[in-house]
Amino acid sequence: MAKRGARNGTKDDGGWGKLIRDVVVILLLVLGIHSCVAKPFYIPSDSMMPVLRNGDRLIVSKYPYGWSYSSVSFHLAPKVDGRIFGTLPERGDIVVLEHPLTRIDYIKRVIGLPGDTIALRNGELSINGKPVKREVQPMLSIPVDPNLPGPDSSLFRFVSRDARGEPVLELPIVRETLPGGATFDTIDMGPGYPTDDYGPVTVPANHLFLMGDNRDGSADSRVDASQKGLGGPVPFDAIAGRAEIISFSTDGTAEWYNPLSWLGALRPNRAGTDLRPERQGK
């Protein structure tokens, strides 16, 4: 008896072989989209507070600065010099990068471009010898939840109780405006932190100086690589993409085995938050 599919002279393409091929094609498509267009990103710490919170999920675009080895998702590409269609970020952009040594993903804000001289004195930032504009803002009150403050956070000292007795973070906010007009909020915990004094350091060609918005709780370009910092300005090739928007945010109460808990764990008013900084004069 002839096998099914052979009666009209065609080869049977069914079975495990076709399934495996389909899965491989899908995986390659996902990898291509993640590497060339956009990918999701999870915030695991408080180093970019107040704009980003532990538990936020973001969309990171891959094309604004061109492509390099760091653009390839899952760290599959070998480290090679060079960037295709490379375009430098603007000061104030939030970028995802591969740590130059460990290849772990970090997310920080671009503060200095090639040729800029960066210095901090008593926590006050200057670029090219000119102090960055700082404006003290009202205290920011954020509800505490299982994801906030994050593990090993520097922010636990700011936990207090609101009028209803609920735990909240009361954060000291300073708004900075960089050369070029990018303006955004930072957390300034006060004097006495090791990263309050730094430099001056001139950013080399094809490098960027990156900092977290939680200025006294961020391992960034000011912090030695032995302390999980970036160890100075970062090669432009290490930049993987630009943070664009918050897709959703969770408070840490969801249980994976209970789908009904997933909706209740969503933080209100976080989805859709634009992560591009305001730019004065534009």
Where are these predicted regions, by residue range?
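Soluble "head" domains of membrane/secretory-pathway proteins
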Residues: A2-G17, C36-V37, F41-Y42, S47-K282
